Amino acid sequence: MNEDRLSQTVEFCKLIDREKFVQRRTYLSDGERLENDAEHAWHMAVMALLLSEYANEKVDVLKVVSLLLVHDLVEIYAGDTFAYDEEGKKTQREREVAAAERLYSQLPEDLAGRMRSLWDEFEEWGSAESRFAHTLDNFQPLLLQHASGGRAWREGGRRLSEVLERNARSAEGSRTLWEFAREHFIQPEIDKGNLIDDID
């Protein structure tokens, strides 16, 4: 056994606990508090197990789960970029690449390569698995927006055009889930006045 390798990997396991401290802007289903990145990742991973039959293409579910669990770890260093923060989005890629290099350099080389490869695959949208993972990354907050009574949308004065722009590629991974979200999560919040319909 290579004890140095094990110790280095266990230290990384301790480090990624910090994902639990990265706060998102989506309320939990009860609307009482905001979720964190780790809760978001866990929720999507379980959703991947349950909803993979609705992917546009056949997917390797373990790969989808892996992509979902890894893709936001960089936010430990880069922080969460709010979906509607146009200024933050301008530097998001640069900050996240630097964070990925810093984060994964703390692993043994082969594991660092594996984790970085998963992150890159998610970012590039090039595989069926990454496209479906992106759909779930968008579907999950829409589900919580609706479950929490549209609280974050209402508080932020969000407009339908913003939500549609944010989800412009959601159907690439699952047309079925995107159509479901529009009908069951988005439209009800428009009807209740929590999301402003600014599209004629």
Where are the model-predicted features located?
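Alpha-helical, largely C-terminal catalytic domains
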Residues: 1-200
